[in-house]
């Protein structure tokens, strides 16, 4: 299997769900569609609101690489990336109904590895048969 590596640039959130569905279809990862869709929706939404401060003139860059059984995702915003970002291991019952704050937790739960380096979120997921 040849590695597939691409980059997509988007502005705002109007077309991100269609782009995500296109990535899943292009890579033939329909069996993992729920996980990948959830991961990318949360990462792109986080980049838009927190990195780009809801400015739809600033790009969000999504890079993806499928090599063998490993899917590598990068979501880069246009922010300064100076703050620290923690992917929580758990959320309390009180936080379950909060307006925000679950996105990073969900990314952590549905990926094998997630970290933020400056203004880029790096996410890794095994797409091997169970």
Specify the residue positions occupied by each region the protein language model found:
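Conserved ATP-binding N-box helix of the HATPase_c
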Residues: 31-56
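A conserved short beta-strand within the histidine kinase catalytic ATPase domain
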Residues: 57-65
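Glycine-rich phosphate-binding loop
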Residues: 96-111
